[in-house]
Amino acid sequence: MIRYIKEKEVAQILTMPKAVELVEAALRERTTGRAIDIPRSRTRIPAGTLQMMQAASPALQRIGFKVYYTGSSKITSYYVQLFDSESGKLEAIIEANYLGMMRTGAASGVATRYMAREDAAVLAMIGAGKQAVGQLEAVCAVRKINEVRVYSRDIEKARAFCTKMSGKLGVKMHAVASIAETVRGADVINVITKASAPALLGEWLAPGQHINAAGANSFVRRELDAAAVQRCARVAVDSRATARIECGDLLPLIDKGLLDWDALPELGEIIAGRVPGRENRDEITLFESQGMAIEDIYTAKYVVDTAREKNIGIDLPIGD
């Protein structure tokens, strides 16, 4: 029967350290040819857009997709459907808002592990929305962070985020009134916004910083200006195929001949040791995250296996 797993049940199962482990494995397996990822497809109508991401892991014997619809509603519902690739049977349907937030954060955690300085201790957060939770938790999972600065256009939102997350993580956090002040002296910078104009400027960056940019997964979005990207000695993407379609931070520079796709490694290539993530302490490094279905599939497989083991979720009265 098909297991149905709700958001709150996913949250019971999936921790950030486990999500980081799973996403790292997914990216490594794809790079070494043992997993397949298909870039996001979009079907647009006047009222909104249906978005679908597909991936497969022959090693896990799983294939599946994530689907969601973005329209005028402020609420977007994400679902992962996971199939057994040997039997062809639908194994599970998972409510995937929480899962998506965790795996997106985990990708930044993996990038931080391989690209940030090992002694990174100060984290700057640009953005304090729902996705910021995963970004914060992931960096704290891979580095000994002792200070977090948070910027939001609504400073009260930033303060509320600090209050909530400092108690959960046991880390000193405070809201900051400007982006420039937020990133000054930071070792790692997380940018997770829906900005259409650059939020992070190159003039604010300092040697040795690492940046995770996870919000510009559309050609109409920009989180970094051209100067910020050009100051980075190493710019990595999760998927070149996907970034070519939708990376709003990089496409303008590519179009002007200021960047070359062939010079931008994928994070999986760094994980596999084919390319260094950082060559010295003074380099500024950047990870551009678009999101990949293979991250969803690896994470979903773990969630489903754990749910069955612990009798979490319900079996739908359909299928064999």
Language-model features, listed with the residues they occupy:
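Rossmann-like adenosine-cofactor binding region
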Residues: 170-255
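NAD(P)-binding Rossmann-fold cofactor-contacting core
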Residues: 141-168
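N-terminal Rossmann-fold NAD(P) dinucleotide-binding loop
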Residues: 132-133
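Adenosine-phosphate binding glycine-rich loop
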Residues: 9, 221-320
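Conserved beta-strand elements of the Class I
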Residues: 123-124, 285
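Glycine-rich Rossmann-fold phosphate-binding loop(s) that bind the pyrophosphate
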Residues: 128-129
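Short helix-loop-beta connector
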Residues: 115-122, 144, 206-207
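N-terminal ligand-binding/catalytic initiation module
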Residues: 1-101, 109, 119, 265, ...
